[in-house]
Amino acid sequence: MPQKKLLNMLMAGKDLAREEMTLCMNNIMDGAFSDIVLAALLALLQKKGVTADEAAGAYASIMARATLCKLDEDAVDTCGTGGDNTGTFNISTAAAIIACGAGVSIAKHGNRSMTSQCGSADVLEALGFAIDLPPSATEELFRQTGFAFLFAPMYHPSMKAVAHVRRELGIRTIFNMLGPLLNPAGVKRQLVGVFEPELMDLYGTVLLATGCRHSLIVHGETETGAAFDEPSISGPTHILELHEGVMARHIVHPEDFGFIRCPIEDLAGGNREENAIIIRNILDGSATRAKTEAALYAAAMTCYVSGKASCIDEGVCMASDSLESGQASCKFTAILQLNRELSGKHKALIN
């Protein structure tokens, strides 16, 4: 489709068919559009709102170009959309570490920050984790520790064509929305935080179509009702649960699981070094109650979708034990040590 026609369609608020979106994304990934046209496309698509067909079409284009990683389909991804502008620390990353300490296999897909100060890749790097392991080394790390971090640019090299425009725009785009759908390990269990409640059904449709076994799509609210793309200890959390092809909706509150409400400001993060300190403090027991409970809440849901906990309450017990017993800290130390060894071997080979 000519770019002028495409822009006019989006300006008129018209939706693209799945096949049209696949062709559009092919052109984006091939660098066929100038930066100005690409920025306009992303902004107009965001303003119009992405449909399930458009998401599926874009997914098909991007995954056709992805480098895949052979892990366990029952591993859990805790990748969220980001873009909620709350400025919190990296809750889902802390939750992934805690859940891994509880025996949950983690295949976390993530990237550097595009719309916030610190993405999951940034904070892991600040914690001493080499994010750029090749797939073979990542598979070995997962085999030995049950933890993998899948750095998006390593597995989606075609995304490089849009990275600078996304960074310059600094707004939510279809790529924020697509991120959790693009795990190169093909995981079937996910905890997905979304920045808009309208995205919940869209995710449900796409995840079911891609063979999801058990996922929780969550949209939290702060104490003022502002959007939060994590399970919220500041207000209610809306959940769309997908389990073996069945959808169910829930609304839960932090008090339901023994957590104490706090203002969103109590979960404030900072730059990568500051967020790394927060995660270290959570692991060693010196973090504030609010930050610890925010991480535990997300870790509990991670344990639940993994199948190791039969409900979120049991997940809270598993996550709390992982943290309080020191299992999470010990596990992360082992992950970092093996990660460094594998990174060193890889660098020696390429040099």
Curated annotation (Swiss-Prot):
Pathway note: Amino-acid biosynthesis; L-tryptophan biosynthesis; L-tryptophan from chorismate: step 2/5
UniProt: Mg(2+) 2 binding residues: D229, E230
Known EC number: 2.4.2.18
Function: Catalyzes the transfer of the phosphoribosyl group of 5-phosphorylribose-1-pyrophosphate (PRPP) to anthranilate to yield N-(5'-phosphoribosyl)-anthranilate (PRA).
Assembly notes: Homodimer.
Cofactor requirement: Mg(2+)
A Gene Ontology biological process term: L-tryptophan biosynthetic process
Positions that bind 5-phospho-alpha-D-ribose 1-diphosphate: 80, 83-84, 88, 90-93, 108-116, 120
InterPro entries on file: Anthranilate_Pribosyl_Tfrase (IPR005940), Glycosyl_Trfase_fam3 (IPR000312), Glycosyl_Trfase_fam3_N_dom (IPR017459), Glycosyl_Trfase_fam3_N_dom_sf (IPR036320), Nuc_phospho_transferase (IPR035902)
Origin superkingdom: Bacteria
NCBIfam families: trpD
Annotated binding of anthranilate 1, by residue: G80, N111
Catalytic activity: N-(5-phospho-beta-D-ribosyl)anthranilate + diphosphate = 5-phospho-alpha-D-ribose 1-diphosphate + anthranilate
Gene Ontology MF, one: anthranilate phosphoribosyltransferase activity
Cofactor note (record): Binds 2 magnesium ions per monomer.
One Pfam match: Glycos_trans_3N
Naturally occurring in which organism (per UniProt): Chlorobium phaeobacteroides (strain DSM 266 / SMG 266 / 2430)
Protein name in the entry: Anthranilate phosphoribosyltransferase
Cross-referenced Gene3D superfamilies: Nucleoside phosphorylase/phosphoribosyltransferase catalytic domain, Transferase, Pyrimidine Nucleoside Phosphorylase, Chain C
Residues that, per the record, bind anthranilate 2: R166
Keyword Magnesium (UniProt): yes
